[in-house]
Amino acid sequence: MRLLEPIKVGKIELKNRVMFPPMTTGYEGRDGTIVEQSFNFYKRLAEGGVSYIVLGDVAPVNTISPTPKLFHDGQIEAFRKLADAVHEFDCKLGIQIFHPEYDVEALAELFRKGDMEGGRAKMRHDMVHFIQEVTEEQLNSILDKIGECVKRAQSAGVDIIEVHGDRLIGSFCSTLINRRTDSYGGSFENRIRFALRVVDKIREVAPDICIDYKLPVVTENPLRGKGGLMINEAVEFAKILERSGVDMIHVGQANHTGNMNDTIPAMGTQPYCFMSKYTKQIKEAVSIPVSSVGRIVTPENAEALIENGVCDIVGLGRSLLADPDYVKKLEAGEGRRIRHCMMCNKGCTDAIQNRKFLSCVLNAENGYEYERTITPSDEKKKVVVIGGGVAGMEAARVASVKGHEVVLFEKETTLGGQLNIASVPPRKSEMNRALRYLTNEMKELHVDLRLGRTADAEMILAENPDNVIVAAGAHNVIPPIEGSKMPHVFDAWKVLNHEELPSGRVVVIGGGLVGAETAELLAEMGCQVSVVEMMEEIAKEESKTVRPVLFESFEKYQVQLLTGTKVTAITANSVEAENAEGKVSLPCDYVVLAVGARPNLFDVQALEDKGVQVSFVGDCNERAADINRAVEEGYLAANVL
């Protein structure tokens, strides 16, 4: 497998072709120092077999950005500790140097004086105007700071310096952003001038260090990203970078639009390997190694990119969050057991946008590396799991890995629970990867599956269990609205499961995630759809990277959205409601209920009377859960056994 072959980059060798590309994690200390959580995260990736890790957005100045920083000598030791740790696994460490594109000193002074409003106003101004206003003197100072940062990194044992070609540097390069009329603006040669000065500065202070350059491409049809170069100029710039001493080029999507879905597309919003046609053009223009990122999910995706001459090295970001042992499993011939990313963006991209730390909804160990681990139990137990949804299967998986005997009861004839309907709406089919992974793990771990069996206390006690984990799920709520039980009123879950199919004019009551997804599905099927929601937001729970796409779809299909509106009654041919403006009557042929879920009840008194230890996880645990909570609760409940 080419993916697992070594490759020479500059004066170093990578043991395979898999890198962890730069991602903001939120794990670092407030001053940007590598702290224990950050250290453990990267060490765990190295242990999993990746050959090259890039720490994203390492600032050479003291910024307010929640990213790593290396701006004073006191931070060197933490970086050295990390470099030593990943080197133990024959993994190379890189840092991506970036500048936040605002006047760091002026902003810091405003905040130091307590002028928070002035500081925020200054930052908003600079994010738009800094590229036009930064002086030659300031640029020279930035270059000096970069040089000092590189020297610190080299003394810490960092192997590779990646130049972040977006943000400040990409803004200089961009015809869409750079409006300067001096030697840094206008012509192609002028616009790339500062980028080349950065490369020269790195080579000046660290002649032997490996240089990687993240080359952002402004992709077209539609135009996405602003900071960077159009592909024709990107190809020419790549040639110049090689002549300037750069050892490797990392091709990525340009950013600067404010929409992270441009650079980290969620499920169904971009094709797999969507940067490949741009990456290949750059690879064909240079002789140095080229890496690529962008919705590369499976080993087959990655292998094809290398085999077809698209790139030499593959960046797996979200995929390694979902399964840090991705490479190890490939090396062991167990690629079928990789826990593949769904590209939901809930635990990763959304977390960073909300200033939380990086995680993955499918991996309960993310952010808790070496704190949460599955170790064999000292005593083998009999564990019964009630429910074969996400929480139940994760609990069964963890209990089995610990060495327990596990029996899982599921009332349906198939596993998956709500995953089976969650993967039905537009763009959501990639959620099936989670279902396939968990279902396969039940087989690999020899979990005793009792499908089509509604478990009761007598049935469970017959198994003589030591522990019972209840993951009985939830059900869609039928609200106490007049007319809610009429024959033309359908259950959203049943609609998603294709058990009930409305047509014509449809009113969806409830604008949460399920209601919004059901509305989009019905609109796509040709229905005339209205959504009525009591609160002020539609699909509030959806990923921030997906919501814009969802609302574009609503606009395309002319879905009527009514927020702050309460339904008062359902009639044979209308939904009656009221809001701040008065009464509303919506003519309809069908009504779909999506007002929320309620936990399924499961009586465990008889089990507890017999001394059986019982725990509840997932939707049935007091309140309906999302997939992140379902996985985490299933993991934690089983891991203490």
Swiss-Prot record:
Where in the chain is the site Important for catalytic activity, assists active site Arg in protonation of C4? 256
SUPFAM superfamilies according to UniProt: FAD/NAD(P)-binding domain, FMN-linked oxidoreductases
Q: Which residues does FMN bind?
A: 96, 214, 295, 317-318
Record-annotated residues binding [4Fe-4S] cluster?
Answer: 341, 344, 348, 360
Instruction: Report the top EC class in one word.
Output: oxidoreductase
Positions bound to FAD: 391, 410, 418, 428, 455
Required co-factor? Answer: FAD; FMN; [4Fe-4S] cluster
Question: Can you supply a Gene Ontology BP term from the record?
Answer: porphyrin-containing compound catabolic process
Q: Which Pfam families match?
A: Oxidored_FMN, Pyr_redox_2
**Entry EC number(s):** 1.3.-.-
Q: Which InterPro entries has this protein been placed in?
A: Aldolase_TIM (IPR013785), BilR_N (IPR054629), FAD/NAD-bd_sf (IPR036188), FAD/NAD-binding_dom (IPR023753), NADH:flavin_oxidoreductase (IPR051793), OxRdtase_FMN_N (IPR001155)
Question: GO molecular function, one example?
Answer: FMN binding
Q: Which reaction does it catalyse?
A: urobilinogen + 4 A = (4Z,15Z)-bilirubin IXalpha + 4 AH2; urobilinogen + 2 A = (4Z,15Z)-mesobilirubin IXalpha + 2 AH2
Q: Which keywords appear in this protein's UniProt record, sorted alphabetically? A: 4Fe-4S, FAD, Flavoprotein, FMN, Iron, Iron-sulfur, Metal-binding, NAD, Oxidoreductase
Q: In which pathway does it act?
A: Porphyrin-containing compound metabolism; protoheme degradation
Active site residues of this protein: 167 (proton donor)
**Record function comment:** Bilirubin reductase that catalyzes reduction of mesobilirubin and/or bilirubin to urobilinogen, a key step during heme degradation. Urobilinogen then spontaneously degrades into urobilin, which gives urine its distinctive yellow color.
Add the further remark from the entry: Bilirubin reductase is a key enzyme in the human gut microbiome. The enzyme is essential to human health, as excess serum bilirubin can cause jaundice and even neurological damage. BilR is nearly universally present in the gut microbiome of healthy adults, while the prevalence of the gene is much lower in patients with inflammatory bowel disease (IBD) and in infants, especially during the first few months of life when infants are most susceptible to developing jaundice.
By sequence similarity, the record places it as follows: In the N-terminal section; belongs to the NADH:flavin oxidoreductase/NADH oxidase family.
This protein's name: Bilirubin reductase
According to its UniProt entry, this protein's organism is: Mediterraneibacter gnavus (strain CC55_001C)
